[in-house]
Each structure stands twice: as C-alpha cells, then as structure tokens.
From Swiss-Prot:
Species whose genome carries this gene: Neisseria mucosa
UniProt KW keywords: Amino-acid biosynthesis, Arginine biosynthesis, Cytoplasm, Transferase
Name of protein: Ornithine carbamoyltransferase
GO cellular component: cytoplasm
Positions of the record's site feature: Important for structural integrity: 94
Broad class of the protein's primary localization: cytoplasm
Residues where L-ornithine binds: 114, 178, 182-183
Known function: Reversibly catalyzes the transfer of the carbamoyl group from carbamoyl phosphate (CP) to the N(epsilon) atom of ornithine (ORN) to produce L-citrulline.
Superkingdom field: Bacteria
Location in the cell: Cytoplasm
Residues involved in carbamoyl phosphate binding: 3-7, 30, 54, 81-84, 219-222, 247
Outcome recorded upon mutating residue 158 to R: In strain: Vedros M1801
Reactions catalysed according to its record: carbamoyl phosphate + L-ornithine = L-citrulline + phosphate + H(+)
Amino acid sequence: KTSTRTRCAFEVAARDQGAGVTYLEPSASQIRHKESIKDTARVLGRMYDGIEYRGFGQDVVEELAKYAGVPVFNGLTNEFHPTQMLADALTMREHSGKPLNQTAFAYVGDARYNMANSLLVLGAKLGMDVRIGAPKTLWPSENIVARARAVAEETGGKILLTENAEEAVKGVDFIHTDVWVSMGEPKEAWQERIDLLKDYRVTPELMAVSGNPQVKFMHCLPAFHNRETKVGEWIYETFGLNGVEVTEEVFESSASIVFDQA
C-alpha cells in the first residue's frame, strides 16, 4: 500500500539510529510475481537486519516473519496497524493527564479494519475503557472481539460495542475515527458507506456529547475533513459532503491532536 507517515517514520527512525534503508515498491520487486513470499523472505533476511512490510494481507507479513530470520515489522495490513498503536498510546498518555488504565476512548465509524481492530486490542492490553460505535454490520469480527475480551479480563479493561454513537462517546477522553472507504476499495463503496455511517461523523455536537470539556479528537490520517483534495472535492460534488468522517470544525479545533499523533 502507498504510504506517507508510516514510511517516513520508519526511514527517519532508522537513519536517526544510523541504519541504512532500502525501499522496495510493489512495481519494482518480484514479490508474488516471479518469487514467492517465502523465498523473498529468505533472501531479504540474509541481506537486512530487519524488514518493514506494509500491504493488504496479514498472511503476507506473517509469512515474511516466519521465514525471514530477522525482525519483521507490520507497517499496516487490512487487519492490523500495530506501529500506529505505539503512536496512539503515546499520544493518549501525553494528553490524558492520567494513567492509561484510567483512560476511556471511543472509535466511531467503520470498525471492521486495521484501526478499530488494533485500537480494540491495544485498549484491552493496556486495561483501558474501549468503546466501538458503529452499525453492527461494520463491527470488528467476532474473533477479534473475543480475543480482546479475553485480554481485557486479565488486565481489567472494559469493552463496549454499540450501534449508538452517542452512547459510545459519553464520558470518554478521546474520540477516534478513520476513513470510511479504505485503500483498495472501489468508488462505488462510498454511497453505501455514507448511508450507513452518516450518524457516526465526528462533529462538534458529537464531541460535546462526551460531556468532557477536555475531550480530544484523534485520526491516524489522511482524513477527509474538507474539499482541499481531489477525492474530497469529488465526494462533495457527488454526495454534497464537505468533510466525511470528521468535520473541518473538529479537525481544525483545539481538541484535535491528530498532528501530535501523526
């Protein structure tokens, strides 16, 4: 998958530590074209001290890790985004003013993919109060939820899944969201997703429902919060939405900590 923040973060971090970096884009390598993941892993593992993978399939990064013989870092798959969780946990710790196990956060929107899955597991591991607000058809898989609940039982974490966005955000310290249509999905998905999620937009009104004057807004970016991109303008012209998952008012407000998070 294409990347701005994740790639830059890995490259800057590596170079800050004196490490060399090679970027292999999909069109410039033989992965899954002329060479299997298993063979690629064994070759790269002999040349490099670590591998970061960013792509669609969780199975790919797990196969790389199985055969590379060196650490493999998951920079994002459809299922999980663990390195983003390091940033999110640090950001919430910096802005909450209290221990993470006394902190509550909500994720509202399409909860089937990497960000909601990862936030659910993160919150469970850290003993946090986690709420997911989404239509039931867009909830995380039962397997992910069961795993998170099992972990939360050990850490004292709380997990709530609800179709009511207002119920999800009441009393929270942070409200997270993500794009409603993910990389690789067709344009046709927008209409269905907007119809399903129109009541889950992060607006000033939803922020106020939290009842917490210090509530913060988080988004892993990129975000559709105005018309200043080609896609944002297309969404406005097609659906009449200026900002999709979050409004410009929230994104540019003092409650927004998205750039600290990024």
